[in-house]
Amino acid sequence: RAFIKQHFYNNCKLYSKGIDDAKKDTSVYQMYWDFSSPLKDVKPHHVLALNRAEREGEISVNLEPDYETTLTMFYDQFNLVNSYYKEAIQDSFERLIAPSVLRELRSDATEHAELHSITVFSTNLKHLLLTPPIKGNRVLGIDPGIRTGTKCAALDETGKFLGYFIINQEHNFEAGKEAVAKAVKEYGIQVIAVGNGTGSSDVCRLVSEAIQEKQLNVQFTIVDEDGASVYSASEIAREEFPELDLTIRGAISIGRRLQDPLAELVKIDPKSIGVGLYQHDVNQKNLTEKLDEVVESVVNNVGVNINTASHALLKYVSGINSLLAKKIVKYRDEKGKIVSREELKNIPGLGDKTFEQCAGFLKIPESENPLDNTWVHPENYALASELYPLIKEQKEITKAMKDQLKNKYGVGETTIEDIILELKKPNRDPRDELPKPLLQTGVLVFEDLKEGMIVTGKVKNVVDFGAFVDIGIKETALVHISEISDTFVKNPLDVIKVGE
């Protein structure tokens, strides 16, 4: 059986054919209407697309192996003394073994494609969550709309909601410009974040003209609003802004995504963020587990300010679950700001084991002990205190000194090196080393584009066949895998990432 399966995999072809020719010209699966490829060469995204098209009754999919060659090779494995044995082998092969093996090959192809899809999604999500924040700026978040108007929400430097207004660019474009200019001056806005949904191009033009005509000292950028509507209707949003309409919550979310993408995006189910590849066609349990792992990894890599983090962010910190995260927020609300890592032990439910797991990831800028605002774990404070004077005075820390510290504190060299790095560059944020969002004062439309023009953009999504890039117009540009580099690219994720 294993021999047959391997031979089928190496030699059989996959064919798909449209079921209703009348739908061919309008079907989204048009390319699969008469599709064929060796099974081993079918790309993962093609497998998932074929499965979906077959499930929706648009096409039929078949695997066609070379039965005769396989049978001949199979006969050679046996000493056939008469035709009876040959007929028995042929019958069992065609009626039992071959159909079973073909089903297994389809299942294997699907499993591999799903695993690949989950890997692509998790990689894209990681890079999206690591998008650098625009810190210390007052932001005007704009959620474009047509029928009910465009919602605008002003936020202070910390993301606190200041006020909102609504403009209708369809019916009163000039009044919209006046409203934006007034808000910029009234709230001291420094950056404008425009959601990329329906009506985005008109709103960008309105903002651009307002900046130029009113001589406003601000810039704007386009923010991916995938999942903003999901957040707006969520329990988290209702708890944060119970008195606000959900459309205003959406504008707040867009603005906060620019100020601190990680803190805002963790409030949304990762599957709603829109950086996947056929994510609805894969095993949802496996997908959820993998995406949660990615979010937890990024949150712990960046670190969390214990006094400003939401319940949604805290629950991803190592050792902290949703229930404990709510207890931390409740403690903070009742007692005021937490002033030391040692105080964490006073929170109900946060025992010694949990403290050991989470303390190094929770930062406290308000603490009198500067180490409470670093990656250094409390169990290594004594070691850090010995190293700090040496680093401050820029003295060389020799191997002999490190060996002495290792023996004294029972730690490895990696721990010592990590502490030295943190003390040299306290409060380092891994996101600071990545490309910042593109800020602009003018706007492009599709008609402005000319062949040969060089434009800058931000990668929104990376898939097997290329990358989707936001270049500041309504339409998202596709950079095909063949155009990504001057050299051969096997996997776009090897050379390009979401957020770049």
Regions found by a protein language model. Give the residues of each.
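Low-complexity, acidic/Ser/Thr- and charged residue-rich accessory regions of DNA metabolism proteins
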Residues: 35-36, 57, 73-93, 97, ...
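Conserved, well-folded catalytic cores of nucleic-acid-processing
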Residues: 64, 77, 128-132, 158, ...
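Duplex nucleic acid-engaging cores and interfaces of nucleic-acid transaction enzymes
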Residues: 1-141, 145-243
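A glycine-rich phosphate-binding loop feature that marks nucleotide/adenosyl-phosphate handling sites
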Residues: 4-10, 142-146, 198-202, 223-230, ...
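Amphipathic alpha-helical transducer elements in NTP-driven molecular machines
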Residues: 122, 174-177, 181, 200-208, ...
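Long, highly charged, low-complexity intrinsically disordered interaction regions
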Residues: 239-337, 352-388, 413-441, 450-456, ...
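Residue-level signature of catalytic and energy-coupling elements of molecular machines
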Residues: 61, 143, 192, 258, ...
